[in-house]
């Protein structure tokens, strides 16, 4: 496959600071807390793509104001509610905030500043990454139609993160435990015929390796893939596009 006839659309959004209030807290797995925010400031909120990221702005107990990137997991325009899923890293300030979050607590959101809208009518969709990619993968699978063909490869060593995906697309799901197993699983895929889109997100060095596998071994067209580093070992608040 050397080309694609489908077109990814990039759109920009006007950025607003939105003051919101915590109205719900859930823990879908041992390593994630889902926090639902509400507020009139969400009336004109827009998230056009499953892998959008917004800035979550919060204060630490010491009074330091921090910003972290999060995927808009679920948005209800009628109720004006927005849910974010926080990964519970051992010493992360955003994780610490989520652990102590309570109804009525205030926070500020900004963005998304733009969306990369990937058509849903590709012949197949590959979604691959580590646990950090799970909120985006869950959202994409919920949005794909029943006719879509989805292949999912996720790296997480914790079985509690291996939640069932709610999707009309009935995806082919493969769970692995280590970065090397993630690379090997994607390398070993027999990708379907037709035009497909490969979306991958996770730790920076692993995603660089995964991108190389897609380009050199699967001959995936560069215009039909998106690879993002959601985090990097030893670096806080990291996000980088790794597209070829």
Go through the PLM ranges and name each one:
Residues 1-244:
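Extended, composition-driven regions rather than compact fold-specific motifs
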